[in-house]
Amino acid sequence: MGLIKKVTHWSYDNLIDYLSVNPTRDEVTHYKVDPENESDESIIKLHTVKDFGSITCLDYSESEIGMIGVGEKNGYLRIFNISGQNSSSPASHAPVGLNANNETSMTNASGGKAAQAENIVGSVSNLKDTQGYPVSETNYDIRVRAKKQRCINSLGINTNGLIAMGLDRNKHDSSLQIWDMNYHDDSHETINPMFSYCTNESIVSLKFLNDTSVLAASTKFLKEIDVRSPNPIYQHPTRLTYDIKLNPFNDWQFSTYGDDGTLAIWDRRKLSDQASLGDLNVASPLLTFEKLVGSGAASRKYMNSCFRWSCVRNNEFATLHRGDTIKRWRLGYYCDSNRDIAADDDNEMNIENLFVSSVHDTNTMYDRVATFDYIPRSNNGTSLICMRQSGTIYRMPISEVCSKAILNNRNSLLLSNFENTEIDEIRVNNEHEKSNLENVKTILKNLSFEDLDVSEDYFPSGHDEPNNEIEYSELSEEENEGSNDVLDSKRGFELFWKPEKLLEKDISVIMRTRASLGYGLDPMNTVEMIDSSKNLQNNAYIRNTWRWIAIAKASVDDGTMVSGDLDLGYEGVIGIWNGINGISNQDRYRQETILSDKQLNKEMEKIIKLRRKNRDRNSPIANAAGSPKYVQRRLCLIISGWDLSRSDYEDKYNIIMKNGHYEKAAAWAVFFGDIPKAVEILGSAKKERLRLIATAIAGYLAYKDLPGNNAWRQQCRKMSSELDDPYLRVIFAFIADNDWWDILYEPAISLRERLGVALRFLNDTDLTTFLDRTSSTVIENGELEGLILTGITPNGIDLLQSYVNKTSDVQSAALISIFGSPRYFRDQRVDEWIQTYRDMLKSWELFSMRARFDVLRSKLSRTKTGVLTADIKPRQIYIQCQNCKQNINTPRTSSPSSAVSTSAGNYKNGEAYRRNNADYKKFNTGSSEAQAADEKPRHKYCCPHCGSSFPRCAICLMPLGTSNLPFVINGTQSRDPMQTEDSQDGANRELVSRKLKLNEWFSFCLSCNHGMHAGHAEEWFDRHNVCPTPGCTCQCNK
């Protein structure tokens, strides 16, 4: 088995030294590697020493550059300088200094690579000389053996010249022999050991820990030996003793393996602690990996296992498997809770508790890899140098996986590789269009549930549904024609799966873009925004949901869903259908009111009459007039938008046919029970196919009263399962069996359409079953359009929870839920969504949108009696009176606490004294006229507590806060002289009105305390720098 070993402390340039032993174990090669060059050209072969017997071990000196030791199976140890100009052949057997004329076995790269190798050798030697590093230019070659010649299993060289040999067992000679090369007699090939240990044992592995300590392992024991002591510091019985390797980042830890390939990681502190207690059975490895390096690993002991500690990252090692896979293991650790970590040194942290945090597999570039080692690169990067079983050396880069991946609040992805100080960023740079909410026209004046859209998300057969997902503008027309080929090609993969594209279409980016456009602050504006914005995930169900909310809000605002003590705002179909049970868990009526089913029906009838006022139409459910739930059914039809008259039918048909959707118009005619109208609609279509279908449907008029089965019914059933258009399918399904459930079971038909059919034609029992079953389905699936069924109620919150779990669209959930909570009910999930969305708006720095959201929430929480149910945070800034130091926005109070807080000067004023002194009010009860005068509202330009006038404006001398000023304060806002009030639209006029109102607000200088109207301050400091108050030299604008 071959060997590659990284050499430390030899190179003082930017190159790294490596020593290798070929798989046949008969030659040693010295390489230099450029760590920053990933090509195989970076591997430069400098020297190769051949003609060894069977190499069993190899080590090098960290202090003597070029000095290596090679142990052989025949018991000889050869020590020579591999970096010298000439490396001797082992056949000479000559001492140091006598082999200058011997033949050198050196293999250099041919051509330019050979010249490069020669330059490197010379440059490195000169560089070391100039920097003062000792370099031995003497070529030496020493061959020695133990007194009892036997196989050398392991070898170690420390920085002081001590050489340790681990030998096979011998009854009369020690197996661990340590000798000093500095005092060796070159005329003898037998060594004279200075220290000897482990008689009648076979040492299979050893490693110098420092100048005096060595870690040795026999086939049965692990031992730490201090050469200054005749006895080991400890010896631990174990069979996991082969190939000791120290952790380069923590020399307390080392690894070994056993004959069956089981790998163990040890901590010397743990072994020494147990030895000091006299208990050898308690000590155990920190981690054990069963058969990790393969069974029969001990038979490969003459080199080393396919195990390497990482020299780049702490707590990482790599293993080779099957010659084609390298696994990189990363360890984590946790400390004992009863130990004070701060008291430990950095190198002595309590890491006895290790665990595997992650494992990453890397496939080798070529198969039949025999061994490998790490190549450290700058910035904590790494690659691998590998040797195949043929002896070929090649370099393999490693694609670093991300140890940290964090998305920021703008959905840019930050990536960090391991402990790399550099951070990669995938930034989302797409700039979406901006929108001004004031420019979106609303049509809420006459909006009602009957105005729900008829288009929805239907696309007739033969037409492609527009894709609201990722738009691929890079595709040309030719590429569109061959889209299948593009998808299968590499270019197509890169095109459709760019990280930037994926991040742009992530829900967090979509939510941020929606928020910047004012999404959800006004339902009808939201519908218009969805229609005009092409870059968002504007699914039809989102649009239809917001349109229903807009109509429900208009009904709440104009009071058409309120009757007496009953408020059915934003209530869904199933809540109304279930009556008292449907609204019992909500605050729909006053708490002191006991509402019965009979009273509820009366209130619902009042709501129906109020909504049907000035509407002359017949009831669409005359066949259910005798039902005990007739009132609920009629109100459910209103809520769902299906309370239509005959004239409304015709308008709906014309709108749908104008859009070219004749199939849908015919299906709506069937939903209204008008089969002849459906035939007429399809017969008027331009497509011959639809006219033929109209002929087939016309057979219903002839066969509807015939009992039994016939060929026409069979053909209709067949077409109902074979046609692609869902509306044609339900038409044929219904006329074949005259069963409305065929329409209700069709999932391709929208929920609102199926709901309209059920409310019109099902009896009470079947309708209850349908509503319960459908509501359970939409809640479980998180179908947002199902809010028309559940309403914004506790059941609706369950639906929104499923929707959030499916889409992560917490924005829509928060904005929708505030229409019902906390006005009608409270739910902790709503509070969590609201807080999450507020935090998101703050992280996106959309503070104005967050303020609008808070204002909208407080408005929607106000009940019909004017009570705010939301927990509104109090204002943090207010204006206080300079006289009494109280908030001028709070109403005056007659409590004793207010009297205490009022300044002493106010008590001299008789009016203030009478108002605030409780004793005076107690005894002076006869002064009714004074009390009546005291209860009169004060002017807006004086303090409501003490009656002091507000400061006057330094420009106009009018008291600040005065309403209905006799002049207009324009401020410094520029206005187009050609633009008149008539030419401005409603939104601009409202904006100008708000600006003029803002110009009348208070404005104070914090230095001189002089005040002005905000608009007057703008006008004054647009031309001046000094305060307008006479005698004041304050520069207020600075």
From Swiss-Prot:
Keywords: Cytoplasm, Membrane, Phosphoprotein, Protein transport, Repeat, Transport, Vacuole, WD repeat. The modification Phosphoserine is found at S123, S136. WD repeats lie at residues 50-90, 147-189, 235-276, 544-587. It is a peripheral membrane protein. It is found in: Cytoplasm; Vacuole membrane. One of its GO terms (biological process) is protein transport. Its main location: cytoplasm. GO terms for cellular component: cytoplasm; Seh1-associated complex; vacuolar membrane. Belongs to the WD repeat mio family. This is SEH-associated protein 4. It comes from Saccharomyces cerevisiae (strain ATCC 204508 / S288c). The lineage of its organism: Eukaryota, Fungi, Dikarya, Ascomycota, Saccharomycotina. The gene is SEA4.
